[in-house]
């Protein structure tokens, strides 16, 4: 055979071998590529599935009904025009002219501060202020001025008709031109005024706490239900975006079984500890001290409970009929008028938990604490911790409070599979030992050190706050909510819901049943502290019983 023929014969064989080798090599390469594509596709699909699992629906506050501008104008009376009374009337659309002046100047100096703009764009509730009642003349006159500020004007504005001042709240309740009342008096008057308002057929917006004594708690509930009036309890957190999102997270079981919840109060400011300034015009002539002392029946209930249980050390020490400006302006510091940390601040935390999880009244409460920082003669503790047990839910809720440290702590819901922290924002992190998400954690689809869900409503629109109290509520998401991208004061939304239920029917989101559950819970915590023993709830008899 010639060399030429040999070459021609060998080349195809060589090419065949090279081709075979290429084929043999290319098979696993293509297979690896295909497998890689498959794995990537599967990973992406699992990521999407996880995303779908944790996707939350848009939230709408209960108040997000259309205002009825052509409906009946609701005629309002306000009882109590202290710190919270001012805030409530302002939220309803009737601000003090001096506040409008301040907001306008703030907006001029700081264009990013939108508080004045938001307030002026707030829809009218179609209400009028017909009557005001406060036992301090200066506050009563300020309430009249605010109630006549129908156009939200500054000090140089044109005002409307002045509401009538009533020196006794029962006279206001008897007025034919008042449909509904906002009650923002001191704690020891809440129950009595709410009962009388309901029996007078007036719709009620009641500030917390619902009651000062345990016996009146039942009377309030019965009076509201029997009268059929529209009752809204004060918790504007019912309108808060992050709380509504948190409720969805619980309903979707994203956290798994929740066995422990921690809630707290942290303040570090005299104002936050109820050491309020004493007004320069306050004296025995401008204050009706006799009315301030309280309703005789309620006072008898209070004194009877204290005496029967050996708690006389918590009464006084000043005589109840002795005029005292400190006790008038700083009444929260004494059990003689106050419900303490449980009635004033635990109530917000408990209502948030009850709104989100529907826990109801706890089975038991155990408390401890004391007056550890503010040695100013107060009888109400400035440090308190209470453990509430819900055995039917396999759940404990811990409340801890100090008025001498502002270390920020949110509400923490601890589940087997994930934990949720809730304040002005919401964060969910998966537990590294989660059973439900173990496979996704192993695959790197879920990373325990990275938030699974983060929700920050209106993050870019945060204005300065003007007091320790406002800062406290801002940190808890209780100042603003967002409806269709527009920022609203949550108290405005809460009053708006109440007004629309009066006008068109319906039950407000924080109704008498929610208020009753909260009142009993707070009383259990308070009695546990005062008596130094665990308190239990007999749900069949509806009674607080001692351990």
PLM ranges: what are they?
Residues 2-17, 21-200, 218-230:
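N-terminal glycine-/serine-/threonine-rich beta1-alpha1-beta2 phosphate-ribose binding loop
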Residues 21, 85, 89, 93, ...:
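Non-transmembrane alpha-helical segments in soluble domains
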Residues 30, 55-57, 244-245, 254-513, ...:
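Contiguous beta-strand/loop segments that form the cofactor/metal-binding neighborhood of enzyme cores
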Residues 77-79, 130-134, 182-183, 205-206, ...:
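Structural recognition of the beta-strand scaffold that forms the well-ordered cores
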Residues 80-83, 136-137, 186-187, 210, ...:
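Short, flexible loop/turn elements at secondary-structure junctions
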Residues 165, 190, 239-242, 491:
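Conserved donor sugar-nucleotide recognition element shared by glycan-biosynthetic enzymes
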Residues 178-182, 198-270:
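Hydrophobic, small-residue-rich alpha-helical packing segments that form membrane-like cores
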Residues 192, 212-215, 219, 490-497:
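Generic alpha-helical secondary structure signal
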């Amino acid at each position: 055979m010639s060399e030429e023929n040999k070459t021609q014969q060998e080349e195809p064989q060589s090419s065949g071998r090279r081709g075979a080798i290429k084929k043999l090599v290319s098979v696993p390469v293509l297979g690896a590529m295909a497998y890689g594509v498959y794995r990537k596709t599967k990973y992406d699909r699992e990521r999407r599935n996880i995303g779908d699992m944790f996707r939350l629906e848009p939230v709408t506050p209960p108040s997000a009904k259309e205002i009825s501008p052509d409906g009946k104008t609701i005629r309002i009376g306000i009882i109590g025009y202290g710190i919270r009374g001012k805030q409530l009337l302002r939220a309803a659309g009737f601000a003090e002219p001096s506040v409008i002046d301040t907001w306008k100047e703030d907006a001029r100096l700081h264009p990013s501060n939108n508080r004045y703009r938001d307030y002026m764009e707030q829809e009218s509730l179609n209400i009028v202020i017909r009557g005001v009642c406060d036992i301090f003349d200066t506050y009563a006159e300020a309430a009249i001025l605010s109630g006549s500020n129908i156009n939200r004007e500054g000090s140089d504005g044109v005002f409307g008709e002045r509401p009538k001042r009533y020196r006794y709240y029962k006279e206001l309740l008897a007025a034919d031109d008042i449909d509904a009342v906002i009650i923002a008096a001191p704690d020891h008057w809440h129950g009595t005024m709410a009962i009388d308002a309901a029996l007078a057929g007036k719709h009620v917006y009641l500030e917390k706490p619902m009651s000062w004594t345990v016996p009146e708690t039942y009377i309030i509930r019965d009076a509201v239900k029997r009268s059929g009036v529209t009752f809204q309890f004060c918790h504007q957190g019912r309108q808060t975006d992050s709380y509504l999102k948190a409720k969805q997270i619980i309903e979707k079981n994203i956290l798994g079984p929740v066995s422990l919840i921690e809630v707290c109060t942290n303040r570090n400011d005299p104002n936050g500890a109820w050491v309020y300034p004493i007004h320069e015009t306050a004296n025995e002539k401008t204050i009706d001290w006799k009315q301030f002392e309280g309703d005789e029946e309620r006072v008898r209930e209070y004194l009877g409970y204290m005496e029967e249980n050996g708690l006389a050390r918590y009464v006084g020490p000043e005589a109840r009929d002795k005029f005292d400006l400190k006790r008038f302006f700083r009444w929260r510091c004494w059990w003689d008028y106050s419900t303490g940390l449980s009635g004033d601040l635990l109530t917000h935390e408990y209502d948030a938990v009850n709104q989100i999880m529907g826990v109801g009244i706890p089975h038991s409460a155990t408390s401890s604490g004391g007056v550890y920082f503010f040695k100013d003669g107060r009888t109400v503790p400035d440090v308190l911790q209470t453990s509430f047990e819900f055995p039917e839910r396999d759940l404990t809720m811990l409340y801890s409070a100090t008025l001498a440290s502002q270390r920020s702590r949110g509400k923490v819901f601890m589940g087997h599979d994930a934990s949720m922290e809730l304040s002005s924002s919401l964060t969910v992190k998966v537990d590294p030992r989660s059973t439900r998400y173990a496979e996704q954690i192993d695959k790197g689809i879920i990373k325990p050190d990275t938030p699974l869900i983060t929700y920050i409503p209106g993050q870019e629109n945060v204005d300065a706050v003007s007091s320790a109290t406002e800062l406290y509520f801002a940190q808890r998401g209780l100042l603003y909510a967002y409806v269709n991208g527009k920022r609203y004061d949550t108290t405005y939304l809460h009053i708006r819901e109440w007004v629309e239920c009066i006008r068109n029917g319906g039950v407000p989101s924080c109704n008498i049943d929610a208020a009753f559950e909260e009142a009993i819970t707070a009383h259990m915590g308070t009695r546990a502290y005062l008596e130094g023993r665990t308190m239990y709830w007999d749900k069949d008899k509806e009674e607080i019983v001692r351990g």
